[in-house]
């Protein structure tokens, strides 16, 4: 599906991370909310600054489920460290591999934790020679791969079962972005999908509630529907997947091969 998105770790600035104090501030802010699961993008570089005991000790103070996204090279290190600590956490892992991974084949994880494994595809060769769940990654020069394997076709729309709840939702909000907040390694806070920072974790009196209120007022991405784009005249605009981060980052707000002028 063209709009599917995953919080995959980035090779760029891979050593950058929130401090343990910043992480504590963020999780403290979530205690009185309805948030149940926190996604954490992790690199072993974090363990060069803090011990695994410090990280696990902090996370265990809260009653959240944690979904950790990391590369396969980092997975065994963190799980081995966690298993040495006599503290139970509600943890699951999304483990990513790509052509640069030292483990070049999919393997079975022997762990007490739930693990999903995904392979990152940068070009058509990555897609053709790998099995399992494959995630296309936009590099800026692989438009042909996205056009062939990711873009929505008219047949995709015609085969879609119309769901009135989804149809109404797509008219009012963007389900890819709505309710999601991103916190970057430098502490800047964004509405998911937005390039505009709303606040920083280090700001005096920082509050995630204020961040949510600000997004509701400014409407950066949470209500970015196809009606707000050049798709606004397309009769399928509320059946298509909502606007995705790929479309925003690539400045291509139309991930399909549908020419509605010819319909």
Where are these regions (language model features)?
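Conserved C-terminal portion of the radical SAM core fold
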Residues: 62, 66-67, 83-163
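C-terminal accessory region of radical SAM enzymes
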Residues: 142-163, 194-241
């Amino acid at each position: 599906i063209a709009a599917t998105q995953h919080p995959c770790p980035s090779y760029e600035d891979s050593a950058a991370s929130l401090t343990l104090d910043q992480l504590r501030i963020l999780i403290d802010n979530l205690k009185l909310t309805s948030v149940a699961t926190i996604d954490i993008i992790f690199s072993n570089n974090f363990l060069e600054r803090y011990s695994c005991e410090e990280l696990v000790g902090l996370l265990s103070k809260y009653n959240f489920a944690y979904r950790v996204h990391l590369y396969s090279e980092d997975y065994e290190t963190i799980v081995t460290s966690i298993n040495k600590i006599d503290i139970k956490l509600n943890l699951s892992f999304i483990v990513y591999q790509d052509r640069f991974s030292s483990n070049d084949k999919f393997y079975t994880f022997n762990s007490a934790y739930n693990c999903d494994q995904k392979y990152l595809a940068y070009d058509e060769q990555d897609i053709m020679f790998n099995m399992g769940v494959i995630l296309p990654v936009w590099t800026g020069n692989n438009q042909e791969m996205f056009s062939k394997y990711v873009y929505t076709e008219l047949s995709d729309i015609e085969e879609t079962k119309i769901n009135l709840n989804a149809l109404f939702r797509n008219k009012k909000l963007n389900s890819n972005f709505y309710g999601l907040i991103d916190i970057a390694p430098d502490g800047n806070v964004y509405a998911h999908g937005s390039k505009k920072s709303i606040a920083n974790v280090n700001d005096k009196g920082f509050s995630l509630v204020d961040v949510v209120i600000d997004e509701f007022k400014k409407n950066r991405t949470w209500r970015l529907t196809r009606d707000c784009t050049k798709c606004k005249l397309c009769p399928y605009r509320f059946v298509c997947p909502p606007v995705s981060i790929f479309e925003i980052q690539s400045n291509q707000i139309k991930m399909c091969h549908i020419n509605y002028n010819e319909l």
